[in-house]
From Swiss-Prot:
Keywords: Flavoprotein, FMN, NAD, Oxidoreductase. Quinone reductase that provides resistance to thiol-specific stress caused by electrophilic quinones. Also exhibits azoreductase activity. Catalyzes the reductive cleavage of the azo bond in aromatic azo compounds to the corresponding amines. Gene3D superfamilies: 3.40.50.360. This is FMN-dependent NADH:quinone oxidoreductase. Its cofactor is FMN. It comes from Cupriavidus necator (strain ATCC 17699 / DSM 428 / KCTC 22496 / NCIMB 10442 / H16 / Stanier 337) (Ralstonia eutropha). The gene is azoR. It is an enzyme of class 1 (oxidoreductase).
Amino acid sequence: MNILQIDSSVLGDNSVSRSLTASVVADLVAATPDAKVTVRDLDQDAPAHLSGNLLPVLGGPKEGLSAIQEAELQRTEQWLAEFLAADVLVVGVPQYNFSIPSQLKAWIDRIAQAGRTFKYTENGPVGLAGGKRVIVVSSRGGVRQDANELDLHEKTVDIVFRFLGITDITYVRAHGLAMGPQFREAGLASARTEIAALNDASRLAA
């Protein structure tokens, strides 16, 4: 089993989402000792954001690329290969200003490629990256409410992964982290309970 751990928080060792993605991965490895883990730190190795200069890297002819574009192409191919090879993705998604970290969006822009991870048909787009399992570690300072229109960070990653053909998506939520010690501890305890529930043998059998 190939596990891809994606961390996008800018808080380093102080990050809740990073500590929780590490816990999820540790439990997965304990259940499947031969698992191969790849860790992609999008803060320390941040993808360049989408720009006109970057567009040739993401599609079209690859002849005549500049040295910078060629380097970005190699990075893009590495990230795409990691994504395609993964059986399980563990993705840390903190909420920043209602949405996902910009470096996570930049990574999505690299791996969401027509003809590679999805295709267009006469009946609409079809995802080509199905068969994977995604575990989203969602962290936020406030408290989530059902159907909250402000939960854009979870909605964003859910839409993206489903667009790419992935339907097995589980959430581990650590919320209320900025609302004082009592809410913070309750949020962390809830997340730890959800992580423990991931160890259902039937879910890990594959």
